């Protein structure tokens, strides 16, 4: 714009024009910062400092799964150091059990692609148990209700016991399948609902509820062993 044209504007219009030009320059700089050719370098520099990445997932938020953090894309570079602390101060097999849960979630993601193409019935009994165990991890362990007076806080002890219950269901169900037990009976066990409610257990009742739930799991699987669908 020439100075002659600019001079014809009123003072108010000049101020508005200058303000808009300033905004455009600012937005251009912001766009270049977040989407420019050096954005990858800035991301990597940030990750080297914080060493943690939380992958927020809109699909989880749409399903009302909170916190809506994708467990497959998120990671922490502190895992090795923190793992030693968890094993020493919470339970000696904390990291081992954590790896079992992560493996189930990763395998679930692979099986979901098969289910989308040919349906759940095409999966083997072992894979169906794997899918159900992964669903329990997502809905019973990872999902948290911040508006619930008990579930809004979860101690490391409770998290550990929840892991043991989910893993117990998975491993004992696989053993039962090897002995000829039908898949439908295992999936319909009443104890599964009790495992899902464990996160609402008060801290002073954790040990007793864990023991009772474990006993129910053992008893119900024992009653099903060898029974076909």
List each language-model region with its residue ranges.
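C-terminal amphipathic alpha-helical interaction region
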Residues: 180-229
């Amino acid at each position: 714009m020439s100075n002659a044209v600019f001079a014809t504007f009123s003072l108010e219009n000049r101020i508005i024009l200058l303000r808009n030009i300033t905004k455009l320059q600012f937005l251009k700089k912001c766009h270049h910062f977040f989407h420019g050719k050096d954005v990858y370098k800035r991301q990597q520099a940030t990750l080297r400092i914080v060493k943690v990445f939380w992958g927020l997932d809109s699909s989880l938020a749409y399903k009302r799964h909170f916190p809506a953090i994708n467990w497959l894309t998120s990671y922490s570079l502190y895992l090795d150091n923190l793992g030693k602390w968890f094993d020493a101060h919470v339970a000696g097999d904390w990291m081992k059990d954590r790896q079992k849960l992560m493996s189930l979630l990763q395998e679930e993601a692979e099986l979901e692609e098969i289910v989308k193409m040919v349906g759940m019935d095409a999966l083997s009994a072992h894979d169906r148990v794997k899918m159900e165990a992964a669903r329990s991890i997502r809905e019973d362990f990872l999902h948290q209700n911040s508006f619930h007076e008990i579930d809004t806080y979860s101690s490391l002890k409770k998290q550990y016991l929840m892991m043991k219950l989910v893993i117990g269901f998975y491993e004992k169900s696989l053993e039962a399948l090897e002995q000829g037990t039908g898949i439908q009976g295992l999936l319909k066990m009443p104890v599964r609902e009790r495992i899902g409610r464990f996160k609402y257990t008060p801290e002073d009742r954790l040990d007793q509820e864990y023991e009772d739930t474990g006993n129910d799991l053992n008893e119900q699987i024992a009653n099903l062993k060898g029974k076909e669908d």
